[in-house]
């Protein structure tokens, strides 16, 4: 084989092995820990807090609209 083909094959193998290593050593452990914490119930979502924040946001938005409607238009 010519050197340019060997170099191309080497670079492709290097890139593929780098992606496989990143997949194996980062994605899989994170997925396993996410599944374990989901089974243990650590990641329960607090929907009441989210609903309260949404209500506060809507209230502030309405107050801002009211304030802007009272300002004169230049």
From Swiss-Prot:
Its main location: secreted. It comes from the Eukaryota. Expressed by the venom gland. Changing residue 37 to K: Shows important increase in antimicrobial activity against E.coli (MIC=8 uM) and slight increase against S.aureus (MIC=4 uM) and C.albicans (MIC=4 uM), as well as slight increase in hemolytic activity (32 uM for 100% hemolysis). Keywords: Amidation, Antibiotic, Antimicrobial, Cleavage on pair of basic residues, Fungicide, Membrane, Secreted, Signal, Target cell membrane, Target membrane. It is found in: Secreted; Target cell membrane. The modification Lysine amide is found at residue 40. Residues 1-22 form the signal peptide. GO terms for cellular component: extracellular region; membrane; other organism cell membrane. Changing residue 26 to K: Shows important increase in antimicrobial activity against E.coli (MIC=8 uM) and slight increase against S.aureus (MIC=4 uM) and C.albicans (MIC=4 uM), as well as slight increase in hemolytic activity (32 uM for 100% hemolysis). Changing residue 33 to K: Shows important increase in antimicrobial activity against E.coli (MIC=8 uM) and slight increase against S.aureus (MIC=4 uM) and C.albicans (MIC=4 uM), as well as slight increase in hemolytic activity (32 uM for 100% hemolysis). Residues 46-74 form a propeptide. One of its GO terms (biological process) is killing of cells of another organism. Negative results: does not show antimicrobial activity against the Gram-negative bacteria E.coli (MIC>250 uM). Does not show effect on four different human cancer cell lines. Has antimicrobial activity against the Gram-positive bacteria S.aureus (MIC=8 uM) and the yeast C.albicans (MIC=16 uM). Causes hemolysis on horse erythrocytes (64 uM for 100% hemolysis). Minimum bactericidal concentrations have also been tested against S.aureus and is four-fold higher (MBC=32 uM). Belongs to the non-disulfide-bridged peptide (NDBP) superfamily. Short antimicrobial peptide (group 4) family. This is Antimicrobial peptide AcrAP2. It comes from Androctonus crassicauda. The lineage of its organism: Eukaryota, Metazoa, Ecdysozoa, Arthropoda, Chelicerata.
């Amino acid at each position: 084989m010519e050197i340019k083909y060997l170099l191309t094959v080497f670079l492709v193998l290097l890139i593929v092995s780098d992606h496989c290593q990143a997949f194996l050593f980062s994605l899989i452990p994170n997925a396993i820990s996410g599944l374990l914490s989901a089974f243990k119930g650590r990641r329960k979502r607090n929907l009441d807090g989210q609903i309260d924040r949404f209500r506060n946001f809507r209230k502030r938005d309405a107050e801002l609209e009211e304030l802007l409607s009272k300002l004169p238009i230049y």
